[in-house]
């Protein structure tokens, strides 16, 4: 008797990806975030779909429609806050997933890594456009400030910004197109995730030691399915605690004020997960320079495979690189804090130093330390 699981054209793809997939026997909980990101994406698409059923993308009614969802729709408040805080959980998992990749040298899977960086950009774009939709003060001014950055592009900048706006300011046309893009992009993300997995399954997973694990593989199911379920439980628990006890903890109070083009909020700042990049943007006095630094702060991830000079793949047995890695983490936390502070002394200089350190660690310090460790192996 043939096993349908292994012969059916469609089911066998699922089988090779989630059931009979050979996985290293020693991957730790840091490898759980891939499945958690998949779950986050599903939660976001489902809650987003139900929100879109009641939301109107018109400047006159957008804010009221969100209020209507929270007050009048059955469990609308739950759906709305699951969607808003689900985005935060998504980014927490993303940052940990990327951090894991950096620590254990997963970036040597070149295609998988680069698709991952493109995914990061796409998710950031989606989150930015989603933040504009409730049409509160921070939505409007955030959209104005961030889209305005494109005007720094020489020659075509101003035309480009007005083309994106669909007018001479952020208005009805902007909101409508942002809603359209915010709706379609998660499906683009889902397609990219498939490609990400396709490339990953060409090589198999990395593991904490960074060594080849072909000699010791175990089936994904039941070992890692049960392990993933634990991660899922913890993620859902954290999300629901956030949603049910302090849904506005990570939001901005200014977004409960309807958008008003005539009154600028005292401190315009994005959601917490963009603050590190926002701090880098603000730390450069020149507009174009700031925009380039902002883009390069994420794009620099693509350089990691080229900057890897160590003879070992993982940082597991490289204490010096470990120290530098954790300094980088501390630096990113510092940048996140600075991004939420007003532009005044001493925050300006702290932000500038943290920005310089960020690029210095990645481009200079980590490769140098890797070479020192290579030398130490010979002695």
Curated annotation (Swiss-Prot):
**Per UniProt, where does heme b b566 bind?**
97, 196
Positions binding a ubiquinone in this chain are: 201
- Does the record's keyword annotation contain NADP? no
Q: Which SUPFAM superfamilies match?
A: a domain/subunit of cytochrome bc1 complex (Ubiquinol-cytochrome c reductase), Transmembrane di-heme cytochromes
Annotated membrane topology = Multi-pass membrane protein
Cofactor(s), names only, from the UniProt record: heme b
GO cellular component terms attached to this protein's record: mitochondrial inner membrane; respiratory chain complex III
Outcome of mutating residue 252 to E: In strain: Isolate S59
Give this protein's Gene Ontology molecular function annotations: metal ion binding; ubiquinol-cytochrome-c reductase activity
GO BP term, example: mitochondrial electron transport, ubiquinol to cytochrome c
Keyword vocabulary terms for this entry? Electron transport, Heme, Iron, Membrane, Metal-binding, Mitochondrion, Mitochondrion inner membrane, Respiratory chain, Transmembrane, Transmembrane helix, Transport, Ubiquinone
- Tell me which PROSITE patterns the record gives: CYTB_CTER, CYTB_NTER
Specify the effect of residue 212 to I.
In strain: Isolate S59
Cite the cofactor comment. Answer: Binds 2 heme b groups non-covalently.
Which subcellular locations apply to this protein?
Answer: Mitochondrion inner membrane
The source's superkingdom equals Eukaryota
The residues that hold heme b b562 are 83, 182
Indicate the secretion signal residues.
Answer: none
Which Pfam families did the record assign? Cytochrom_B_C, Cytochrome_B
Subunit structure, per the record? The cytochrome bc1 complex contains 11 subunits: 3 respiratory subunits (MT-CYB, CYC1 and UQCRFS1), 2 core proteins (UQCRC1 and UQCRC2) and 6 low-molecular weight proteins (UQCRH/QCR6, UQCRB/QCR7, UQCRQ/QCR8, UQCR10/QCR9, UQCR11/QCR10 and a cleavage product of UQCRFS1). This cytochrome bc1 complex then forms a dimer.
What job does the chain carry out? Answer: Component of the ubiquinol-cytochrome c reductase complex (complex III or cytochrome b-c1 complex) that is part of the mitochondrial respiratory chain. The b-c1 complex mediates electron transfer from ubiquinol to cytochrome c. Contributes to the generation of a proton gradient across the mitochondrial membrane that is then used for ATP synthesis.
Q: What else is known?
A: Heme 1 (or BL or b562) is low-potential and absorbs at about 562 nm, and heme 2 (or BH or b566) is high-potential and absorbs at about 566 nm.
Q: Can you name this protein?
A: Cytochrome b
Query: Which organism does this record belong to?
Result: Spermophilus pygmaeus (Little ground squirrel)
